[in-house]
């Protein structure tokens, strides 16, 4: 489990056959797809391009059939092409980002941060990171994507970056809590080390996931995510300038998912919670009426 943006769309969509769309896949019924559809064309295409980039580098990190060196080289190639793009040089696979970068003044360091986040997964399965490492990971694979997005949404940079900070972490923590068992199957566990040790839970994936004390650790992490959702809601409810339906929908959809998990708990055996598609559409209609 890596980028929040990738996790937000599990199925396939395709708007057209342009380079920026060629490898994009997502869900026509997902919160990402629904949220992006309400944007004006230029903003929508820019978001699809950002997603395309995220999807490609995320797939490199998740390609468990490729060797570590092959995947490292692939991420290094992306890093080279992003740097070339901003230097005005031939930029290879990053060429589809030229227009959104120029139009919306997207920052080089945010693209690089996403790549660096994928590289964290590449160094070996992330297992029980310390809290500082987990926060850095969330910043790179989720909040950095948010920082790119808020420029497309036309938000004030300071307000937008604050929204990206909180909403990115909220979404990523929600994904981590949702995908505990799925991640464990590939030898990963993103739950932070310190609360597990404090609870006396062994730092062994199989033992930790079967431990009844895990429920409280997960609930505490869920409340951290709730705090980030609350901070995001506070920013959005102040009605800053920009196209806010997309982040509002993401926040509404994923905070609802988190509430479902809190109601269900994390005691073994766990049942993975999913989005309610009709509820997503209803939320979109409600947000359009109140925007």
From Swiss-Prot:
It is an enzyme of class 2 (transferase). One of its GO terms (molecular function) is squalene synthase [NAD(P)H] activity. Keywords: Transferase. It catalyses: 2 (2E,6E)-farnesyl diphosphate = presqualene diphosphate + diphosphate. Pathway: Secondary metabolite biosynthesis; hopanoid biosynthesis. Residues 1-23 are annotated as: Disordered. The keyword Transferase applies. It holds the Pfam family SQS_PSY. Gene3D superfamilies: Farnesyl Diphosphate Synthase (1.10.600.10). Its EC number is 2.5.1.103. InterPro entries: Isoprenoid_synthase_dom_sf, SQ_synth_HpnD-like, Squ/phyt_synthse, Squalene/phytoene_synthase_CS, Trans_IPPS_bact-type, Trans_IPPS_HH. One of its GO terms (biological process) is carotenoid biosynthetic process. The keyword Transmembrane does not apply. Involved in the biosynthesis of the hopanoid precursor squalene (SQ) from farnesyl diphosphate (FPP). Catalyzes the first step, the formation of presqualene diphosphate (PSPP) from two molecules of FPP. Belongs to the phytoene/squalene synthase family. HpnD subfamily. This is Presqualene diphosphate synthase.
